[in-house]
C-alpha cells in the first residue's frame, strides 16, 4: 500500500515522515502500487542514495517528475525529516501545479504552498504546516489529495479538473 509499517513492522503514526518515505507515497499515488514497486535504477544522481537502496527508484521518479530535488552538494538526505509545507508542495505538484508558475520556488514559496494547500483542500485541519509532519498527518494529507482537483496548464491558461472528472475552470 501507500503506507506500510516501518522496518520493525509498526505503522508508527507519530513518527516523523522522511524524504524517502514521501517519495514512495507520491510514486504509489501517481503510478499505483504495482508499477511504483517496479521502479528501479542502476545509478543515482545523489551521493547519499545507493542504487540498491529501497527508496532509490521512488526518489529517482520524483526527481525526474520535478516533485523532489536534492538538498545540495550532490546529496538527497533520504532520512531527513519533512515539514508539512514540503509535503504539501509535493502533493500540489503531484496534482499538476507547476512549481515555477505557482511560485513554489524562491523566498515566498512557503506562503504560496500554504495558501494553495488550504485552497485545494489538502491541508488537514489543525496541523501546523511549518512543523515536521508525522506519518499520520501525511496519511491524512495524501488521502485528501486523492480527492482534490487536478490542475492542467494549457496555452489558453489553467484548467482545473474536479475529482469527479468534470472541468471546473
Please tell me what each predicted stretch does.
Residues 4-56, 65-85, 92-132, 146-169:
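Feature responds to low-complexity, polar/acidic, surface-exposed segments characteristic
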